[in-house]
Every structure is written in structure tokens, then in C-alpha cells.
Amino acid sequence: MEAVKSRDGTPIAYERAGSGPPLVLVHGSTSDHDTAYRYVIPMLERYFTVRALDRRGRGDSGDGLDYSLERELDDVMAVIESAGEPVNLFGHGFGALVALEASLRTANVRKLGLYEGGITTSRSTVYPLGTVERMESFLEAGNRDGVVGTFMTDIITMSTDDLSVLRSQPRWLERLKNAHTIPRELHVDRDYRFDTGRFANFQVPTLIVVGERSPESDHADAEALAAALPNSRIEVLPGQGHAAMHTSPELFVAAVGDFFLD
């Protein structure tokens, strides 16, 4: 792992692998770089110099006292600048929101990929009443499993059967380590407002990725986001949901890799 310092001095770690055009990967909630991208990095590194970062508070990265979206943007910007040239930037889940906003702050993003970031252009994000507060109570009680489980069922709308499978996998323990970061991200996500006017002249070529089996709200958000970003298109991943990096790595790499290499 390598590391750069963010603007507030926090070390942000990233795995660098492969050779070719630079590709920065930003993971979503409950994950770190390895949990999110372990199955696709070995394929992507054949074509790109991959920098897969651990967002603050996870993995080998540090954390800070004052969490905010701005801090997240500073972190991603630091990794982008470490490449020394324009990069391809990809974000998944909450990482897609971070990647999109970071792209407004630099001229060093060549292309952008966004996979189900929950970025809605017409309304604020609404979670089931009391969900975030219940997760905070779990966290205060030391019940990390309750935090992550509630996130999966109430926010991601994962079925109880799928959650049971996820809990049986070794990477569930890694997700539990990151449980403390989930409520704070949900507060940021809930307060975020997408202003279409800020993106009216946004010309970075953008791929908006959505799984065919993902909820209709994700498809609606993708359509609205594509309408708001002038140089964008939608890629629907057949038979997939929110985590094609795990469920169909080859399909994911083919779709994303072709876009960034074109």
C-alpha cells in the first residue's frame, strides 16, 4: 500500500497495481478498497495503472475529527493528483457521489464512471423513519453487526436470504470493522442536494452504471442523472444488482474497461 496526505494531513492509503492509463477506484459504504474491488483489480491491472483507495476511516487510511463530504473530496483529489496526469475515475455507491463531486473540482479527470450512487436530481434522499438513529444506537452499544445488517436490509433493501449469505462470507468481518463510518455517510447523503445547474457545462465523459436487477428507483435516478450530465450515457449490467464487482467481475470489467479504454 502507498499513501498520500489529504489537505487536513490525514494519510489516505491506496493499492497501486498494473500499468497503463491511470484508473482511480473509489469504494462505497461498508467497504474498503479490497472488500469492494478484490475480484476486479487483477483484471483491470492488465490495462490500467490502478489506484484503489481506502476512504478515510477504513483499511490503512487515517481518519479525522471533523468528517464531511468536503474531507472525502480532498482525499480523492489527493490520490488523483498523485498520478501526475489526468485519470479515469470510478465510484461505487457513496463513492460515486464522492467521485462526481470531486470531478467538479479538478481538470484532471479524463473519464468518469458512476455505479448506483443514489444521486437523485429531483428530491432529497429519504431513508425509512428512524433507520439512521437506530444504527447510531447499535454503534453506541458496540453492536456492529446490527449497524451493517440494518444498512443492508433497510438502506440497500437486501433480502434476508441474501443477507444470510453475505454474513457467512469472510469479508463480512471486514465490513464490521467499517461500521462506524456508515451513519456519518448516511447523514451526508441525506443532506446532499444535487443542483443540476452546477453540472450544466460538465463535459467529462461519464458512464452511469446500473444493475438490471436493481430497484426501479436506481434506474430512475440513472435516467435523471444522465439527463443532467451533458456528456453521459447509461450502461445496464444484465442480470446484476448493486455489486457486479462480486457477482459478475468479468462483465463488470468488460463494461467499465471498454468505456475507459475507448
What are these regions (language model features)?
Residues 5-62, 85:
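Conserved HGGG/HGGXW glycine-rich cap/lid loop of the alpha/beta-hydrolase fold
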Residues 51-90, 254:
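Active-site loop/oxyanion-hole signature of alpha/beta-hydrolase fold enzymes
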Residues 54-58, 118, 240:
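Short beta-to-alpha linker loops that shape the active-site pocket of alpha/beta-hydrolase fold enzymes
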Residues 97-140:
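Flexible "cap/lid" loop of the alpha/beta hydrolase fold
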Residues 170-195:
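Hydrophobic, aromatic-rich cap/lid helix
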Residues 202, 208-210:
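Short beta-strand/loop motif that positions the catalytic acidic residue
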Residues 215-221:
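Conserved alpha/beta-hydrolase "acid-adjacent" motif
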Residues 231-262:
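Catalytic active-site module of serine/aspartate enzymes centered on a nucleophile-bearing elbow/loop
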